């Protein structure tokens, strides 16, 4: 049977556990391999059972990982229960000629390269893996209770990184604005005319940015204020109480399709002079009746890791990370 592959369709797959800005960066780069106007990116996400068999217990369950990936600005469609070893027949089903992956090796339970077959078929494209961020690294910080201090050179994002993650759904055009502390200090200009009076604002530290947070952002953007732009203020807190750096939190939030602007190091006065609705993440008005927001919190995620502490310590040790 002849399969008609579409050059404007591309495939990426993965566990997308603790869907962080490294995953988002790979998704963004994959979207850029197809046309700005008509490109479509299919994100295949593995089941809990497949991950358990090939890699070990995921922290986030299938439903959480599917929906988090679906909330990514550059993901056109999530393909649930995609096989752990990339199958060209699945790519054919969605008319994708190529699969995109980072410049690292992913192996299955037998120690085989998950992309061996598609590489041999010439249907594999490589993008640059994001340095210094991984699910393994985040789990390591939870286990050791150690985070990077604000004085670390990689604690804050560069302007180049902010510009890269601020692009629109087509992965090229400008979209998100980025501010420092308040709206007077613009770091990145967005792709629309900004008016603070035409926005809704929510703040929080957005540590371990997860579907509980995203549920609330979706509610603000789609239900409570569908005619407003959504500004997210990412607050500074005692660094020892946050697991992720400001860079990791900001870039993760920028990748969310419900977000139109971000304020880095926001504080209580950042938006006080503006006549717009203001919220705080995690409050009842935002969490009520949310599929994920009613139960999923940073604290619950930490408990999941701690409840299987020995399992994750052993898994991380295999990757060269000792407690």
From Swiss-Prot:
Official protein name in the record: Ethanolamine-phosphate cytidylyltransferase
Keyword Methyltransferase assigned: no
UniProt entry keywords in alphabetical sequence: Cytoplasm, Lipid biosynthesis, Lipid metabolism, Nucleotidyltransferase, Nucleus, Phospholipid biosynthesis, Phospholipid metabolism, Transferase
Expression triggers: By isooctane.
Pathway assigned in UniProt: Phospholipid metabolism; phosphatidylethanolamine biosynthesis; phosphatidylethanolamine from ethanolamine: step 2/3
One Pfam assignment: CTP_transf_like
Domain of life, per lineage: Eukaryota
Organism taxonomic ancestry: Eukaryota, Fungi, Dikarya, Ascomycota, Saccharomycotina
Molecular function as annotated in GO: ethanolamine-phosphate cytidylyltransferase activity
Main location: cytoplasm
Gene it is expressed from: ECT1
Keyword Cytoplasm in record: yes
Catalytic activity: phosphoethanolamine + CTP + H(+) = CDP-ethanolamine + diphosphate
